[in-house]
């Protein structure tokens, strides 16, 4: 449902773009929503180039200052890294909703100044957790007890510790974006 919602946002808002950043270990799409002002989208490739240049250790301090004045801040927000911590993915939905539906001065300033990358960090674990919880038809019979099996195909709950090795497809997908 999160993926369908993000797709819809990407289709209907001039402030959002939905993209698939790769496949997960179990073959699901891992998606990202890019959120910024409509004006920033006109120069998005330029801002990407500036960000890549700023990430280069060979530039001088003066070049870095000049580039930072020309670019936009990039903010990464992921959710759902640990599948049993379900609020993580839900905050992405709420944050996207707030940024895309509000037209107050503060929201407009954020969207003008920042490019926000919002990613579901663990679609496989989320699907497993959801199926486990919803296995009982009657809500009163549903259990919040932990899953009786290892989740996150190769790393278990420790998928956040994979960011230095990048063994998992999910970590690799995220690494390519950063």
Predicted feature locations:
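A non-catalytic alpha/beta surface segment that caps or lines the substrate-entry region
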Residues: 2-39
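N-terminal low-complexity, intrinsically disordered segments
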Residues: 29-31, 40-51
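Active-site/substrate-binding loop(s) of hydrolase catalytic cores
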Residues: 36, 47-81, 86-178
